[in-house]
Amino acid sequence: MATIVRQKGLAPIEETSEVKSFLKERGIDYDHWKVPYNAADLTDKEILADVEKEELLKKLDDRFETLKEKEGYQSRDLIVLHPNVSGLNDMLAKFDRVHYHTDEEVRYIVDGSGVFGFVLKGEKFLVHVVKDDFISVPRNTNHWFYLDDKKRIKAVRYFRDMSGWVPNYVEETNSLD
């Protein structure tokens, strides 16, 4: 389950209902979707071949079909990051700066973990996401992302239109201080 980390001196938020409420009040959609048991053979592997990525996506297609019908998403892919990915640090450097997109950034974490940071109306906070977490960052929301110390994540990315996913960087620090 996700954990919210706020400014120093404020306790983290760990209870699922409180996490949902905190994020909902800020316009961020969050849910906890259990990864199907029949996907464990693929989610447990560190490295996936392209054919295995597609197989895993198909095992998760019930979520995609629901999002297509309710939210208009048109495509999805699976990003698999781990310490052995060539150029991992360069890839991550694109996302750990504060930026926004003109479309939602929608992720379903099916293995591993990472951290989204947000700047909303002068408030900064982190959302540590883990397996089974679903998060939708609203369009035009200043945020950043980085992997936690485990440096491992598998996430389904859902898109309405790929052109809306280009990062637009802003002059803002990603520090909670």
UniProtKB/Swiss-Prot annotation:
GO terms for biological process: L-methionine salvage from methylthioadenosine; L-methionine salvage from S-adenosylmethionine. Keywords: Amino-acid biosynthesis, Dioxygenase, Iron, Metal-binding, Methionine biosynthesis, Nickel, Oxidoreductase. GO terms for molecular function: acireductone dioxygenase (Ni2+-requiring) activity; acireductone dioxygenase [iron(II)-requiring] activity; iron ion binding; nickel cation binding. It catalyses: 1,2-dihydroxy-5-(methylsulfanyl)pent-1-en-3-one + O2 = 3-(methylsulfanyl)propanoate + CO + formate + 2 H(+); 1,2-dihydroxy-5-(methylsulfanyl)pent-1-en-3-one + O2 = 4-methylsulfanyl-2-oxobutanoate + formate + 2 H(+). InterPro entries: ARD, ARD_bac, RmlC-like_jellyroll, RmlC_Cupin_sf. Its EC number is 1.13.11.54, 1.13.11.53. Ni(2+) binds at H99, H101, E105, H143. The keyword Amino-acid biosynthesis applies. It comes from the Bacteria. Its cofactor is Fe(2+); Ni(2+). Fe(2+) binds at H99, H101, E105, H143. Pathway: Amino-acid biosynthesis; L-methionine biosynthesis via salvage pathway; L-methionine from S-methyl-5-thio-alpha-D-ribose 1-phosphate: step 5/6. Pfam families: ARD (PF03079). The record marks R107 as: Important to generate the dianion. Binds 1 Fe(2+) cation per monomer. Belongs to the acireductone dioxygenase (ARD) family. Monomer. Catalyzes 2 different reactions between oxygen and the acireductone 1,2-dihydroxy-3-keto-5-methylthiopentene (DHK-MTPene) depending upon the metal bound in the active site. Fe-containing acireductone dioxygenase (Fe-ARD) produces formate and 2-keto-4-methylthiobutyrate (KMTB), the alpha-ketoacid precursor of methionine in the methionine recycle pathway. Ni-containing acireductone dioxygenase (Ni-ARD) produces methylthiopropionate, carbon monoxide and formate, and does not lie on the methionine recycle pathway. This is Acireductone dioxygenase. It comes from Leptospira borgpetersenii serovar Hardjo-bovis (strain JB197).
